[in-house]
Amino acid sequence: MSIDIQWNLLDEQIAEKLRAKLDTKIAKLSLPRYIQDLHITSFDFGTSVPDVTIQDICDPDPRLYEETLYSDDSSSLDDEESDREEENMTELPPYGATENGVHKKDSTDVNMNHTQTSNQQSPQNIAESNIHKSVPNSAETPSFLRNSIGDVQIIAHVQYSGNMTMSMEACLAVNYPSKDFAMLPFTLQLSDIVLDGTLVVALIASHVHVCFVDTLEHNRGDVQSSIIKNIRVDSVVGEPNKQVLKNVAKVEKFVVQKICQIVEDEFVWPSYFTLY
């Protein structure tokens, strides 16, 4: 079953909340010596609507109820999220991003497509194994975790290839002939973002939780992204009219890989993002 999405409801307030969450994680990164003050300046959902195919409608996962109760009773949701993320970090699959970059004059396309092996499960089976099998029967679920009328969880296959964009800024340090001899302003624009994955949306009381389910079978040394399939990178180093360097592939690769890693860590189950 396919549905129409009111994409315009993802307004500036939600975009800013997402930008702030990503920027908080960026600020905690260990940066190379030549990159300083890396931060996200803007995020825009764009106007292109993803293709969404509903795979299942069911009761929300009980663990989402636990978090909803904690967040309602807590004065600091961010602290609760941080605690949860640290506890769940060991549950996340190995991460990496394959970069088959096509370097053009002022841009880089980072393609993360993969070939699925015959023994891999379908997105539907993965979603069922990762979500449904973890949900106890109602008799096994404590009464305070049982869903109320109207609570629902939607599992859907989402394909997106649109005009979503994100802008970043940083300073590149020139350490020759001495340390920090010069600081060059660096701007980076991420666009042509392609997403393909199984999305879970849980509506619980007044809260909306979203996350992706990893549909890849990860092996040691696996360098594939389960969600992001492509990103175009446009970068400028130096003043716009006095460019010193172009296509700083090493910096672009680092930034894109870290962005993809954050997406995997923060938006792939058992981690999730609360829209409201």
Swiss-Prot record:
The terms under GO molecular function for this entry are:
lipid binding
- BP GO annotations: mitochondrial genome maintenance; mitochondrion-endoplasmic reticulum membrane tethering; phospholipid transport; protein insertion into mitochondrial outer membrane
Task: Give the family per the record.
Answer: Belongs to the MDM12 family.
Extract the InterPro entries matched here: Mdm12 (IPR027532), MMM1_dom (IPR019411), SMP_LBD (IPR031468)
**Cited Pfam families:** MMM1
Q: Which UniProt keywords apply?
A: Endoplasmic reticulum, Lipid transport, Lipid-binding, Membrane, Mitochondrion, Mitochondrion outer membrane, Transport
- Record flagged with keyword RNA-binding: no
Compositionally biased intervals (Acidic residues): 75-89
Record region (Disordered): 68-104
Q: In which organism is this protein found?
A: Schizosaccharomyces japonicus (strain yFS275 / FY16936)
Q: What assembly does the database describe for this protein?
A: Component of the ER-mitochondria encounter structure (ERMES) or MDM complex, composed of mmm1, mdm10, mdm12 and mdm34. A mmm1 homodimer associates with one molecule of mdm12 on each side in a pairwise head-to-tail manner, and the SMP-LTD domains of mmm1 and mdm12 generate a continuous hydrophobic tunnel for phospholipid trafficking.
- The primary location reported for this protein is mitochondrion
Tell me where in or outside the cell this protein is found. Answer: Mitochondrion outer membrane; Endoplasmic reticulum membrane
Which residue numbers delimit the SMP-LTD domain?
Answer: 1-276
Note the topology in the membrane: Peripheral membrane protein
Q: What is this protein called?
A: Mitochondrial distribution and morphology protein 12
**Domain annotation text?**
The SMP-LTD domain is a barrel-like domain that can bind various types of glycerophospholipids in its interior and mediate their transfer between two adjacent bilayers.
Pull one GO CC term from this UniProt entry.
ERMES complex
Question: What is the purpose of this protein?
Answer: Component of the ERMES/MDM complex, which serves as a molecular tether to connect the endoplasmic reticulum (ER) and mitochondria. Components of this complex are involved in the control of mitochondrial shape and protein biogenesis, and function in nonvesicular lipid trafficking between the ER and mitochondria. Mdm12 is required for the interaction of the ER-resident membrane protein mmm1 and the outer mitochondrial membrane-resident beta-barrel protein mdm10.
